[in-house]
Amino acid sequence: MLTQQSISLLKSVEKISPDFFYFTSTSLLYRAALENVNHAKTKSVRNFFINLKNEKMIQDLNELNEVFSLIEQAPLSDTISEYSAVVIDNYIKRLLLACGDSLCLISCSKQLIEQKNITSIVSQLTKAYEILDEKDTQTLATILANLLVHLDTRKKISINSSILSGFTELDSITQGFKKSDLIILAGRPSMGKTAFAINITRYVINQKRSYVILFSLEMSTEQLLRRILAQECNLNGQKIQSGQLNNDEWQYVIQKSKTLANLNLYIDDSAKISTDTIKTKVKFFKLQGKNIELIIIDYLQLLQESRQSDNRSQELSLITRSLKILAKDLSLPILALSQLNRNLETRSDKRPLLSDLRESGCISKFNYLQTSLYNQLQILFNCYYKKIEVINFSAQKQQLFLAIKCSISKTGKKTVYKIITEAGKYIQLTSNHKLLTTQGWKRCDKINQNDMIAIQIKNFEEQKNVFNSFSSLTFESIQKINVTSLQIVFDLECKPLCNFISNNFIVHNSIEQDADLVIMLYRESYYTQETRSRDFTEVIIAKHRNGPTGTFQLKFNAQIAKFSDA
């Protein structure tokens, strides 16, 4: 049972990060103490000192005496919250002093002011603001009470607080974009992703009378405005671009331009923008009192990540994770446009799949899939282009489940890694496939011999397609990792948990896991000259975390790049 003092101590610890301390030595000691509290099996002072010694933080007797001296000076647990408040207050003051120093340096410098300098200062100020605005963890009773009040309010006013797109079928399936949702809009080039986003932008601004922020990394503000004008005036985009308009058309453009000038639309066409910069700009915009309803990013692959990665696919994973965190932090839906990889061009059926969102990880044809408690099927002989049921893992419920049918498709030849555990179990898969480890999902090319890999064991009982994972999973160390050769590999698409068991390993099937909603655009006339479907675009709801998926059609006017209900 946790005492009131223990709860107070835990709350204080949660609020303080190691970098809040001024002295590096104190920061390192606090980090070691956190490791002892959060990860050690036995929480003790002895383990704390063992960690210090292992990390080479204590070299001699004098340093050991210094640590003992700090422990003797430690405040009583009933005053810990006051001391933690002092630590936080001093850290914020140091942040503000650093901002002041930076402002003085920039102001006195003879060089031209660069945007990155201002962004850095605003970022530090935002960080200070967020620390002061930190929300405490709420009890389940409080959350439920707030939820019931919210539901009762919605019932009375009968208005959906979600952001509607203006497309009847899309809104029917999704019930609108929810706050903190990350929505991915994907398609091959020229499918109309930007036009689709502009359609939604115009509708949201008209309905909500709120701001939409559009970060355009591909087009300039002028190019985007020409597209918006074409949609607004129902005029051929080429005519507007060339300026070949008759008098009536020209007067109409001027009239519509006056309307557009008052739109609550903010366009940022900065190049090489990062998720951190987007966060800073949006928060700065909100501090000005602007009511923002939606953020649009065009497009995902052109975003930069502050933490550079050796692998672009890994970097995109970091970006999507950052965008999801940002959407939750801002309590705003983020619509991110995305390209699909060109592998789908080699398929006979070019209708996009979730695995086309990025270079999908694949497994060797010689691997086996766990399809039930005792049955395994080798991909090469049993699974080619078939749909089969497989066992997958729910991290939320900590259980293994018999999944719905998993689709398998051949993706050609790729270089394959072979990972072998100390117990002799092995699996062959491509570099960007993920495996479950003690540290969560890790890509094959990021796994090393210090990692522990999740392995399925056979001493569990099957009950209604659910297995108790505490007796069915173990973690094994890695003996070696080899790069083998080019092999025929296969891609698997498993819903809803996006993973499966192969050769007893828990394998992620590389589907974009951070998005709440994935919308894909497909137009048959892009690949064929079939006139019957030229004016129609298929909209595929490929993933919907909070509801059903589905497919419907929209009319697409290529002349003015505008979508409308079919």
Curated annotation (Swiss-Prot):
Name of the protein in question: Probable replicative DNA helicase
UniProt-listed GO biological process terms: DNA replication, synthesis of primer
Main location, first listed in the record: plastid
Post-translational modification: This protein undergoes a protein self splicing that involves a post-translational excision of the intervening region (intein) followed by peptide ligation.
PROSITE patterns named among the record's database cross-references: INTEIN_C_TER, SF4_HELICASE
Quaternary structure (record): Homohexamer.
Annotated Pfam families: DnaB_C, Intein_splicing
Organism: Pyropia yezoensis (Susabi-nori)
Binding-site positions, ATP: G187, R188, P189, S190, M191, G192, K193, T194
Listed CDD domains: DnaB_C, Hint
EC number annotated for this UniProt entry: 5.6.2.3, 3.1.-.-
Gene Ontology MF terms in the entry: ATP binding; ATP hydrolysis activity; DNA binding; DNA helicase activity
